[in-house]
Amino acid sequence: MNKIAIITAALVGLAGVSGAQANSLGRPCTSAPESQWLSLEALKTKAEAQGYKVQKAKLSAACGEIYALDHNGARTELFVDPTSGDIVAKM
């Protein structure tokens, strides 16, 4: 019974950490004005050119957030610089 409680507590803790990371990068990806940003479609195209299968994308807090599948089919969240499409972070 004690093992079940420990495993449950560990899983709950891990779920909280991954949920907190998935919300946002916590810092802007660029300081450039929005007039210099690429369109959301252009950001998605750049991610797809790198082998990602884009499922959803949005612009948030001066970052492009792209939810995609990598070449192995694993879910990933990409944070991209909206001025260039360069990947700044991957979770």
Feature roles, as predicted:
Residues 1-22:
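Classic N-terminal secretory signal peptides
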Residues 71-73:
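Glycine-centered tight beta-turn/hairpin loop motif at sheet-sheet or coil-to-beta transitions
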